[in-house]
Design a protein with these regions (language model features):
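Compositionally biased, intrinsically disordered/low-complexity regions enriched for serine, proline
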Residues: 1-2, 22, 158, 167
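Bacterial N-terminal signal peptides
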Residues: 11-26
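Carbohydrate-interacting regions of secretory-pathway proteins
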Residues: 28-273
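N-terminal secretory signal peptides that target proteins for export/translocation
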Residues: 1-10
Length: 273
């Protein structure tokens, strides 16, 4: 059917618009690719041993890797409990040697096997990335968790929804929507990951300004003003030493909470430069 001149003009304009829409995304993709290539991610885990990392396991001295809790096998950083007769709340953390303020940390993790005997019910398929944490030297021998911001990693139980990359706050608080959050844990909006598939968790930390949680590249949680909780006795001591409750930098550590977990990548992008 022959189109009137006005409709022909409209079709020509629309065709041009469609062409624009087709071309521009390609340009953006190339730009994003160039940006990704320019990002200088460094691996915090060498795939061979625990060089650069120090264990702090409850009831044990700093540096003592009780029952070989943290080990490297087949190029994978593993957290296991085959050397435990019973867990007995022997929570542990593997600390990286340096502290950071502005950065992105990215891990690939999965839960495997069965929970250690005596592990608490809430710790089933549970681990975490601790950011803006205290240094392990300031922890007492019987201290369970470092004062820190915890990016809680959870695996599905095969039945119910169970989000991952949630927020938990041992000795800390954060602000969301201009409201101080006092609840210990806040769920993200991630999907549930059942089974033993590998999941990519990323955390973007910008000093005391903002922290963002991403799962497989999707933003699932965001908050501001990470800070020590002056209601907590140990955190109060840290506030007195630092002269402020605001957390602008701190340690990074990985948890052992009674369920075997594996990390095949632990990478960091320094945003301070």
């Amino acid at each position: 059917m022959r189109l009137p001149p006005t409709l022909l003009c409209v079709r020509t304009v629309l065709s041009g618009a469609m062409l624009f829409l087709i071309v521009v995304p390609g340009a953006l993709t190339a730009q994003d690719t160039a940006k990704a290539e320019s990002e200088k991610w460094i691996s915090l885990f060498n795939g061979k041993n625990l060089e650069g990392w120090t264990p702090k396991i409850r009831y044990h001295d700093l540096g003592e890797n009780f029952a070989n809790t943290f080990r490297v096998e087949d190029g994978v950083l593993k957290v296991g409990y085959d050397g435990y007769a019973e867990f007995k709340e022997t929570f542990g953390h593997l600390f990286y040697k340096d502290s950071f303020s502005h950065y992105r940390i990215r891990v690939e993790y999965r839960f495997v096997g069965e929970q250690a005997k005596g592990g608490p019910g809430w710790a089933l398929r549970n681990s975490g990335i601790m950011v803006h944490g205290e240094r392990p030297e300031t922890m007492s021998k019987g201290q369970d968790f470092p004062a820190s911001i915890e990016v809680q990693l959870l695996g599905g139980d095969g039945k119910t929804p169970r989000t991952t990359s949630n927020l938990c706050t041992p000795g800390t608080n954060v602000v969301m929507g201009e409201k101080l959050i006092l609840a210990h844990c806040t769920n993200s909006k991630s999907k549930t990951f059942h089974g033993d598939e590998w999941v990519t968790a990323e955390v973007e930390v910008k000093g005391s300004e903002v922290v963002r949680h991403l799962v497989n590249g999707e933003l699932v949680l965001e908050y501001n003003q990470p800070q020590l909780d002056d209601r907590d006795a140990h955190a109060k001591e840290l506030i007195q030493k630092a002269g402020t409750k605001m957390l602008s930098s701190g340690s990074i550590s990985l948890q052992s909470e009674s369920h075997p977990v594996e990390f095949r990548k632990v990478e960091l992008l320094d945003l301070s430069k």
